[in-house]
């Protein structure tokens, strides 16, 4: 019997694979389809109603800047600016499309997106009224920002009836600022009565009227910010605002509010910013205001407040900005103000404050950058302690009664950029300029109405090579300074605005003034200047082509009254100054150079009150930006160029008291100029003078010459025709 061999392995026998039946094929296909369907359903797909609402919204807006490229073939939760929640039906919760250049209207379909919690359409061009029921239907909305658009009309705030006043809304931040909205914000609003979670409410820069809606402090106890500024709100500030105990910001400036500031405001212990300027508020500043220990900014300027600055103002140790200017505040500056060591800006301009300033410890105000005490009645010398405020960039003491000289200690203010000391009783202009030229960052220097009857230093080497390296505005007007226009001014190669008016400068206008590369505003009026207008003056580069510059803002506004109008003109930016040449009331002779036509940027040209002769140059018509042209009280002759009617921006034109003749142009702006602006020219006619223009002998001769020449031409023509006819025969 044979035994089995050890290790013998049985061969593996495999059966052939049977093909799947048709039923099995169908089963597997169903499995694959269901799997794919499951995977598809598991991905976020936005709610169908929300999708349709978004499509409707997009159809109402357009943008050439950044159009909405919403691809309808993909899920709307993936569209730009759209966010959905994690629920199974993926509701839209956020629409965020700020600064997209969107124009059009806000579609009411947005109200159908019921779970919307944030809507931001700020900084666009949307217009029209807000849809009816807009606020109350979006009861899940927490953040609404429609600021910086052009929405108009009244707010669609439904009034409460029956139990509707018990509705509550989720809104926390509501910003409708910088639109064209109007009407009153009523206490009976269903929506505003139910905003129990509201933290920030901003309706600034609109046209709302009626009383400030202070009732919101009762319905919205969480309020932290209220901004009603730049509207037409009127009436008194309500005591109810004292209920907003969590308020940190209260802004209601630039309205028509009246009455006193209610004492309840001083219970707002969390308040950091109190902004109530440019109203009609009266009364005194209550000393209880010093209880607002967290206050960082207090702005009550441009009201009718009176009395003294609270003596305990120094208790506001967190104060960074104190602006009480343009009121009727009197007394002295409290010494405790030196305890406001965080103060950065102090503006008490245009009040009735007085006394000396030497006792105030300015040395404690090391953060102070801007100090404006102008237009008060402060006396004595410019306090040396000010020069220990090392951070100062701008100082104004204009319109006071300060005496003495400028101290060399001013050089310790290494960041000083703006100095306005006009209309005081300062002396020694030579010493002042010798010192101040060392202020390396000084860009604005206004010393007008000081140094009476002194002689200005004139030599070119008076100014060191690095003196006034950044000076852009220089004013010494109305000082009655003697001498010639100083030669050292040629070294002010950064100067853009120069006022030398109302002095006693003699001699001719130096041609080198026309070489100052950035000069675009020059006032030489009311001096004793003689000679002719230099041609070089009309080659000022900054008046020939527009210059684009940075650092346009001034640290403090500048006030000018060049035409003796009732109010000063305020300039907050350097390039708010109109490109100007004033050379009024001097003793200039000769003609107006034709080179004047090169100054195409010029807005104002006034040469009145001189002895200029010759004709009005036709080249003036090249000054297409010209707004004022005054050539009155000279000896100009000839006619008024008709080409001046092409000056479309010309709003003032005066040629009275010259020797002009002929018709006054009757096109363009010339029909709007008053009769008085042409009087004193006996031979002028027509236009607003309503006198007929008789043809002059020269014109009659011209007509005869034209007739004679026309006759000769016709004779030649007829002779030529006769010759042709004869030849044809």
Curated annotation (Swiss-Prot):
Gene3D superfamilies: Ribonuclease Inhibitor. Residues 45-707 are extracellular. It is found in: Cell membrane. Residues 729 are cytoplasmic. Glycans are attached at residues 60, 71, 145, 163, 202, 205, 256, 267, 288, 315, 330, 339, 375, 428, 564, 587, 611, 622, 635, 657, 705. Keywords: Cell membrane, Glycoprotein, Leucine-rich repeat, Membrane, Repeat, Signal, Transmembrane, Transmembrane helix. GO terms for cellular component: plasma membrane. Residues 1-44 form the signal peptide. It is a single-pass type I membrane protein. Pfam families: LRR_1 (PF00560), LRRNT_2 (PF08263). Coiled coil: none annotated. This is Receptor-like protein 2. It comes from Arabidopsis thaliana. The lineage of its organism: Eukaryota, Viridiplantae, Streptophyta, Embryophyta, Tracheophyta.
């Amino acid at each position: 019997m044979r035994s089995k061999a050890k290790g013998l392995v049985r061969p593996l026998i495999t059966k052939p694979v049977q093909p799947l039946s048709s039923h099995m094929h169908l089963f597997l296909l169903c499995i694959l389809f269901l799997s794919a369907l499951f995977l598809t359903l598991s991905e976020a797909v936005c709610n169908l109603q929300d999708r349709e609402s978004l499509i409707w919204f997009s159809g109402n807006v357009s943008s050439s800047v950044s159009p909405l490229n919403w691809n309808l073939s993909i899920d709307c939760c993936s569209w730009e600016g759209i966010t959905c929640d994690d629920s199974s039906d993926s509701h839209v919760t956020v629409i965020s499309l700020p600064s997209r250049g969107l124009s059009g209207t806000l579609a009411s379909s947005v109200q159908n997106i019921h779970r919307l919690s944030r809507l931001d359409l700020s900084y666009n061009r949307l217009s029209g009224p807000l849809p009816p029921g807009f606020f109350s239907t979006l009861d899940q909305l927490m953040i609404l920002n429609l600021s910086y658009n052009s929405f108009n009309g009244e707010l669609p705030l439904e009034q409460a009836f029956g139990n509707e006043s018990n509705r509550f809304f989720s809104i926390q931040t509501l910003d409708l600022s910088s639109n064209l909205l109007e009407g009153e914000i009523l206490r009976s609003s269903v929506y505003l009565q139910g905003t129990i979670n509201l933290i920030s409410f901003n309706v600034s820069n609109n046209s709302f009227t009626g009383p400030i809606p202070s009732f919101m402090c009762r319905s919205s106890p969480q309020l932290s910010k209220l901004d009603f500024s730049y509207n037409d709100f009127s009436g008194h500030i309500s005591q109810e605002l004292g209920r907003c105990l969590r308020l940190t910001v209260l802004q209601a400036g630039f309205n028509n509010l009246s009455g006193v500031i209610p004492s309840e405001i001083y219970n707002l212990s969390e308040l950091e910013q109190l902004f109530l300027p440019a109203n009609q508020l009266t009364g005194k500043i209550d000393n209880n205001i010093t209880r607002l220990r967290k206050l960082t900014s207090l702005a009550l300027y441009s009201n009718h407040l009176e009395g003294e600055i609270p003596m305990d103002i120094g208790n506001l140790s967190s104060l960074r900005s104190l602006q009480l200017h343009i009121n009727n505040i009197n007394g002295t500056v409290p010494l405790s103000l030196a305890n406001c060591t965080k103060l950065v800006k102090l503006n008490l301009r245009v009040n009735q404050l007085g006394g000396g300033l030497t006792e105030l410890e300015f040395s404690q105000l090391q953060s102070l950058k801007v100090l404006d005490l102008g237009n008060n009645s402060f006396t004595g010398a410019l306090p040396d302690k000010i020069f220990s405020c090392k951070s100062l960039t701008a100082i104004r003491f204009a319109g006071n009664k300060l005496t003495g000289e400028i101290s060399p200690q001013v050089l310790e203010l290494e960041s000083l950029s703006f100095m306005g000391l006009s209309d005081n009783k300062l002396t020694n202009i030579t010493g002042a300029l010798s010192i101040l030229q060392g202020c390396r960052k000084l860009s604005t220097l206004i010393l007008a109405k000081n140094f009476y009857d002194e002689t200005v230093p004139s030599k070119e080497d008076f100014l060191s090579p690095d003196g006034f390296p950044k000076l852009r505005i220089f004013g010494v007007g109305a000082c009655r300074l003697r001498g010639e226009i100083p030669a050292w001014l040629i070294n002010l190669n950064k100067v853009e605005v120069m006022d030398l008016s109302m002095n006693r400068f003699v001699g001719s206008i130096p041609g080198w003034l026309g070489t100052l590369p950035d000069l675009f505003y020059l006032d030489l009026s009311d001096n004793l200047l003689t000679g002719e207008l230099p041609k070089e003056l009309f080659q000022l580069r900054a008046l020939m082509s527009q210059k684009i510059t940075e650092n346009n803002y001034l640290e403090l506004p500048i006030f000018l009254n060049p035409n003796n109008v009732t109010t000063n003109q305020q300039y907050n930016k350097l390039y708010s100054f109109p490109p100007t040449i004033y050379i009024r009331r001097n003793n200039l002779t000769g003609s107006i150079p034709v080179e004047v036509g090169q100054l195409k940027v010029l807005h104002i040209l006034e040469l009145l009150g001189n002895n200029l002769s010759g004709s009005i140059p036709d080249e003036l018509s090249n000054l297409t930006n010209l707004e004022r042209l005054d050539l009155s009280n000279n000896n100009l002759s000839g006619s008024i160029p008709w080409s001046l009617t092409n000056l479309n921006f010309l709003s003032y034109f005066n040629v009275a008291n010259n020797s002009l003749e002929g018709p006054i142009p009757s096109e363009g702006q010339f029909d709007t100029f008053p009769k008085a602006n042409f009087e004193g020219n006996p031979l002028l006619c027509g236009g607003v003078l309503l006198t007929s223009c008789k043809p002059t002998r020269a014109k009659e001769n011209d007509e005869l010459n034209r007739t004679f020449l026309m006759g000769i031409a016709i004779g030649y023509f007829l002779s030529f025709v006769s010759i042709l006819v004869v030849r044809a025969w």
